[in-house]
């Protein structure tokens, strides 16, 4: 590309990083890195009443956690700042005045009540999509001066050209056409409080920051003609647009922040012990697909392969099961030290282990986490997975009860119990040898041998490697559970 690629992700600090925002940020990032360009994070904080405390910090921290190492923002000046819209108000004012002077914009003194009456009258007349009548468009300079002298509040509206067609090429959708009559009439570019509206400020920012490409959600598609009007009035070249398809839930309904069937914020996945590299991989496949069947890719591979022509034109389903599966694939290959960092805090938080562990307790916890590395889908899952190690008395699953009711069980368990009592040291290797001895003594092997022992000491018929699980349970607990299984009637 001849022009340097500069993209932007522009979150509002009215909330934390949502999965939809994360996907948008990621596609901007992949495109920029693929073309050797720059990614800018601009904070669109003009909706002051809705901004939440810590929202800005949370957005940036979660982007960095995901591995989106942007080039310019409020914490990384690149010479195109300020990067907060509330710090750019003087800049917007300059361009608003230019439009007023050129006659492309005007002051509107209509009150909210007058505007509502206008809309109601249009609806009563059968107009489905009411438009602003433009009555303040024709005020004379003298009338404007008089209304201002009376202290009447006003907004500033952009004059919408009549009978004009706006056409642009979208990198996802191809040719898109809008008519000027469909934007709702002359629209507000500056609110009564002096703050510019989104569709005006975003054009000024994108132009001055030399943004070359805009990747954003399809909900912004209807904003595009308004923005093109501003570009045209200033004689500026607009960026190339790519409107990403909706993210839908498993019922194929548009993802709503009120939908409690899906965890929707990146920080929540982080708290649950998901891995950033797995989340990065998953988000990359949410509306984009590489060639072939492979689904696990490193960040560098995704950057190298990213091609806008493979962005989907259909809604993307947020498949929680797939994310959990993908995270498990990453956990299986994870360095044990990092897995311990991920999972151990959850055992402490659940009260399973003390915060100030001894070296012996820490080693035991490390061995426990290693035992479940293949099964664990996310860090917090260690708590339910390992529950049997912390219970005083286990509950037997139905399948375990069926196994323990088999006729060979008393002989297997009593023989194993005798071996366990004498076992020193109580290690996985010694336990393996003891189970082998039970096989020799009872003639039982395979499931008839292992299943009763597993069912008796864990209450389950499936689980981690048995000799290691028995070692971690400890001799005393194993003896208690074997004795109970021999006494209980199944």
From Swiss-Prot:
Its cofactor is Zn(2+). Gene3D superfamilies: 1.10.10.350, HUPs. Transmembrane segments: none annotated. It is found in: Cytoplasm. One of its GO terms (molecular function) is ATP binding. Keywords: Aminoacyl-tRNA synthetase, ATP-binding, Cytoplasm, Ligase, Metal-binding, Nucleotide-binding, Protein biosynthesis, Zinc. Its EC number is 6.1.1.17. ATP binds at residue 257. Zn(2+) binds at residues 108, 110, 136, 138. It is an enzyme of class 6 (ligase). GO terms for biological process: glutamyl-tRNA aminoacylation. This is Glutamate--tRNA ligase. It comes from Geobacillus kaustophilus (strain HTA426). The gene is gltX.
């Amino acid at each position: 590309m001849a022009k340097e690629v500069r993209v932007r992700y522009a979150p509002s600090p009215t909330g934390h990083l949502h999965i939809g925002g994360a996907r948008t940020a990621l596609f901007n990032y992949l495109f920029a890195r693929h073309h050797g360009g720059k990614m800018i994070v601009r904070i669109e904080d003009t909706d002051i009443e809705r901004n939440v405390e810590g929202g800005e910090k949370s957005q940036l921290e979660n982007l960095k956690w995901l591995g989106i190492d942007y080039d310019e923002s409020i914490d990384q000046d690149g010479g195109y700042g300020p990067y907060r819209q509330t710090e750019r108000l003087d800049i917007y004012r300059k361009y608003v005045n230019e439009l007023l002077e050129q006659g492309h914009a005007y002051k509107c003194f209509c009150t909210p009540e007058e505007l509502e009456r206008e809309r109601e009258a249009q609806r009563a007349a059968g107009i489905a999509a009411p438009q602003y009548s433009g009555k303040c468009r024709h005020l004379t300079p003298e009338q404007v001066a008089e209304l201002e002298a009376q202290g009447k509040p006003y907004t500033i509206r952009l004059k919408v050209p009549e009978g004009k067609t706006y056409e642009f090429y979208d990198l996802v959708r191809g040719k898109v056409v809008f008519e000027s009559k469909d934007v709702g009439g002359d629209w507000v570019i500056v609110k009564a409080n002096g703050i510019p509206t989104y569709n005006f400020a975003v054009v000024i920012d994108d132009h001055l920051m030399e943004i070359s490409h805009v990747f954003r959600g399809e909900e912004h598609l209807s904003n595009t003609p308004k923005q093109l009007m501003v570009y045209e009035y200033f004689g500026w070249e607009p960026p190339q647009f790519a409107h990403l398809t909706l993210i839908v839930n498993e019922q194929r309904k548009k993802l709503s922040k009120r939908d409690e069937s899906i965890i929707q914020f990146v920080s929540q996945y982080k708290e649950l012990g998901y891995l950033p590299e797995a989340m990065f991989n998953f988000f990359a496949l949410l509306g984009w697909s590489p060639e072939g069947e492979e689904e696990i890719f490193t960040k560098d591979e995704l950057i190298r392969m990213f091609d806008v022509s493979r962005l989907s034109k259909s809604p993307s389903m947020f498949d929680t099961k797939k994310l959990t599966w993908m995270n498990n694939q990453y956990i299986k290959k994870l360095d044990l030290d990092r897995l311990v960092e991920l999972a151990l805090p959850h055992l402490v938080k659940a009260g399973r282990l003390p915060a100030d562990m001894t070296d012996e307790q820490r080693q035991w916890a490390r061995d426990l986490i290693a035992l479940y590395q293949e099964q664990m889908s996310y860090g917090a899952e260690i708590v339910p997975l390992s529950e049997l190690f912390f219970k005083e008395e286990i509950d037997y699953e139905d399948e375990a009860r069926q196994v323990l009711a088999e006729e060979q069980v008393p002989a297997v368990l009593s023989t194993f119990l005798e071996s366990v009592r004498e076992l020193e040291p109580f290690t996985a290797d010694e336990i393996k040898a003891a189970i082998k001895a039970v096989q020799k003594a009872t003639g039982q092997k395979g499931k008839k041998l292992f299943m009763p022992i597993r069912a008796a000491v864990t209450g389950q018929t499936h689980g981690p490697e048995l000799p290691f699980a028995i070692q971690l349970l400890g001799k005393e607990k194993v003896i208690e559970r074997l004795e109970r299984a021999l006494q209980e009637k199944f």
